[in-house]
Amino acid sequence: MAEEQQNRLQNAIDTMVKSLERDNIRKMQGKMFRCSAQCCEDNGASMQQVHHCIERCHTPLAQAQSLVTNELERFQNRLARCTMHCNDKAKDSFDSGSKEAQVKAQLEGCVIKCAEEHMNLIPSMTKKLKDALAQADK
């Protein structure tokens, strides 16, 4: 059961990332490449000027990718803390004399609850990221 929840959570994250890539990141990549091409077409610019121009073109995309990566890391860390809390509770129950089957059931229930709670965070995280990416694309 916990594995099923984990798969649902992973699929939801994958869907979110694909949506962000398709609707936001890809457009920013196109702008970055067109901007970089314009830099290269400036025959009067020095090699260093062209390089700086290309770097400026790449900055919004790099910031957007960093934003998504950081948000996903925060989400993953929160989920890991939640499951560690479940493990700690299970160990405490086992140490206090609870039967192994009871502890396993408690652990699985706790982990499923973590997954469900974090599944509920995905829509707001998606909106937050889409809003931030739209702002970065201006």
From Swiss-Prot:
Q: Say which family it is in.
A: Belongs to the FAM136 family.
Name by which UniProt lists this protein: Protein FAM136A
Q: Which Pfam families match?
A: DUF842
> What domain of life does the native source organism fall in?
Eukaryota
